[in-house]
Amino acid sequence: MKKLESTLVNMVGVLVAVALIMGGILAFVNHVTEGPIKQQAEKTLADGIKAVMMSDNLTVTANDTIKENIEGKECTFIVHKAVDAQGNELGAAVESTTLGFGGDLKVLVGFNPKGDVLGYTLLAHAETPGLGAKADTWFQKDGKASIIGKNPASPLTVSKDGGDVDAITASTITSRAFLKAVNQAYNVYVKKNNTDANSGATTQAGVKK
């Protein structure tokens, strides 16, 4: 009986030791990879801002997080305001997320000071690979239903809903979600501009991306 108890104690001791070692290894790996992952995410965003603002020579002057209640749900937007090398306002790149066919669809949309769409890129999505790839090109300048240059003051909608934007073939849900993200990004951008104007906010130089 004592031998059995001793064996059980040894087994428990070994399991605890293994668990502690594995926990330590996982913590170390997380610590080692956390920095590079964060740096890569920041680089991806910085490159995305340049792409959607159509400028390699810009300075991001503000990164404002804005929360809006949309259809009873709190949604988070991030507005990245930018200026050119001479300090002239370029507009802003806005991060916007909506629910697509497979899950969240996160879009980065660039607007000029008038609110016209300069460019866009998908930051993340849970659509099938084919739909995600199509959404990233379908609405581009050389795509089949370009939104570049359009102003969402009149909300962008697909043809099936009475709009003038052709939906991705066999993917109306993803198209609606994408355009909704763009429309919401525009509304937040305009609201932010109005708030800044009313408060007398001025642009200050930031860190060049």
Give residue ranges: language-model regions.
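Flexible, solvent-exposed loop/hinge segments and secondary-structure transition points
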Residues: 2-209
